[in-house]
Amino acid sequence: MKPTILLYDSGMGGLTIYDAIRQTLPNAHYLYCFDNAYFPYSERSENVLIEQAVKIVQKIAEKYPLDMVVVACNTASTVVLPALREKFAFPIVGTVPAIKPAAAISQTKTIGLLATKGTVERPYVAELIEKYAKDCIVEKIGTTTLVELVEEKIRTGQVDQERLIEVIAEWQTHPTLDTVILGCTHFPLVKQELQQLLPNVKYFIDPGNGIANRVSALLSESVPEEPEQNKENIAFCTKIDEEFFKREVIMQQWGFKRLELLNFL
């Protein structure tokens, strides 16, 4: 059996998680949903995030027997995991800011959490800091702008350098910051740009590999002897807009056969 893994995010940032999992489990069957009707999640209420999570997983599970769901979004993961685990029997894996490894690796005990406003403000994140980084100074930047810049980079290949500098300017002169947590699945896609703008930061912590290892541990993958039918990797969106065909090309470049509208009617 090829395990079927659904990943979802409000945008295409969750592709960084998909890419890490695919490198570990290249023969799995992948479904990816970006909930562009509600992008960005950082601007949505907790109730809306929970409602959307359940609707998306339920709708896709009706057509595809799922073996696992990966919530490839930090903002959603800080809210929706209990509701999903209560409703569905298959494993649900979340994406939360890598506070613990960052605190362990930082030599100056000064770490930066770069995430969305929603993630930075969640009580769950405060609990992680209290539990794993009590001996650290944790500087936080909550930004929706950077999410938008990454989506733009995915579509055009270009990053607006001036807007990027505006987002992280306060860290450029920080005397002791040596570790930055990429606390949104979009942000590894601008890791190179961040490294250039923050040369004093030694470590950029990306959660992708840790999640891939967790998924791999939960799934026992077996490669079928014969190719299985109806196991194409498919991407879904929740709204058709002027970017639809451009996004379909992008998703095909990431290994998805086609992009479909997820219709809740």
Curated annotation (Swiss-Prot):
GO-annotated biological processes: cell wall organization; peptidoglycan biosynthetic process; regulation of cell shape
Gene3D superfamilies cross-referenced by the UniProt entry: 3.40.50.1860
SUPFAM superfamilies with a match to the protein in the record: Aspartate/glutamate racemase
Coiled-coil ranges per UniProt: none
A Pfam family the protein falls into: Asp_Glu_race
Known pathway: Cell wall biogenesis; peptidoglycan biosynthesis
GO molecular function, one term: glutamate racemase activity
Similarity comment: Belongs to the aspartate/glutamate racemases family.
Protein's name in the database: Glutamate racemase
Organism, scientific name: Actinobacillus pleuropneumoniae serotype 3 (strain JL03)
Lineage start: Bacteria, Pseudomonadati, Pseudomonadota, Gammaproteobacteria, Pasteurellales
